[in-house]
């Protein structure tokens, strides 16, 4: 059973008209979780994308990013919601469909010039990833690529990210679904 078929679809969540793609059914399955990490590991061992550290976006980016960092022998840096990191941070505000939100990273999280693989579970609008990228840059990092389990291309996030000059990789996509 491939990765895509292990992802549950929940209609009208979190609001009417939204088809929510729930990766919890994928990662609770040991074979599914292994497929995700093994496929990403293979890509980054063989693909030639150079990076020094993985940055994961709260919360599901932590699950995938930390397992991938372990598999590749890389470090892991969290990007978190405000007030969750104990040392000095920098923050970035970003737009939501119904307001704004903010994410933070420790100011000493990355070495100057560190090449970063930015990881999250799902790419929809691209808002969170496009907020995390300038955070990484503020603390001296360079985004080598952004990796996701799921891309929802009809929502347009991938186009926005590519337009900003970043590279994108996703394991699967739900186009027109």
UniProtKB/Swiss-Prot annotation:
GO CC list: cytoplasm
Cellular compartments annotated: Cytoplasm
Keyword annotations: Cytoplasm, Glycosyltransferase, Purine salvage, Transferase
Gene3D superfamilies referenced in this protein's UniProt entry, alphabetically: 3.40.50.2020
EC assignment: 2.4.2.7
InterPro entries on file: Ade_phspho_trans, PRibTrfase_dom, PRTase-like, UPRTase/APRTase
GO molecular function, one term: adenine binding
Chemical reaction(s) catalysed: AMP + diphosphate = 5-phospho-alpha-D-ribose 1-diphosphate + adenine
Function text: Catalyzes a salvage reaction resulting in the formation of AMP, that is energically less costly than de novo synthesis.
Family note: Belongs to the purine/pyrimidine phosphoribosyltransferase family.
Protein name (record): Adenine phosphoribosyltransferase
